[in-house]
């Protein structure tokens, strides 16, 4: 039986969002590098080199790849045998708390693009104060 603690879920969501904010997927970096190696046009090579340099700087400095960090979409699947521990929040509230913490991380604050949810009446998990 899997046991999931509330704080672990919140931290996992926050950590995952921070991670994807500053790391390009390896297949993307490999594809840009391969295209750079094949490219004959100097301006195109320069543009791809800058993309690769920027990608590395983001990864090393833990800074977002793009200023607009987008909209968070979480797909959350829980098995029947999961046992929750230390839970005082609903799964949705735990995920929203993880998103909030990721966006307000003191070392890498992310820019919130959405002020309120477009589909429902619930507010964005981002603090406004």
Model-found features: residue ranges?
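Alpha/propeptide regions of enzymes that mature by internal proteolysis
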Residues: 3-62, 67, 71-73, 80-116
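Single conserved hydrophobic/aromatic residue that forms the stacking wall/gate
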Residues: 120-129
